[in-house]
Amino acid sequence: MLEEAVLGAILMDKDGLPAVIEILRKDSFYSPAHQLIYETMLELFQKSQPIDLLTVHESLKKSQQLDEIGGINYLMELSNKVASSANIEYHARIIAQ
């Protein structure tokens, strides 16, 4: 649930990834799908592209990895599960342990 909350917060808040980039690595995530989503977010960030539901979806689709994470429906679930990104750093530190 924490992994989902952090990924969802990153999807909904443009400052989400910068808040956790020094805390989390791809292998901080237990779920392979979450690792792939986070890796995609990092790639977008490194290219100075926005990180949101649409850009992550398009990137995963282009790399033919969308099905590996559960498709667009799973990305939408992630973004819908988070009411706020206020505690993203705290949650990221728990995941990183």
Residue ranges and their predicted role:
Residues M1-Q97:
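Noncatalytic partner-interaction/assembly domains of nucleic-acid and motor enzyme complexes
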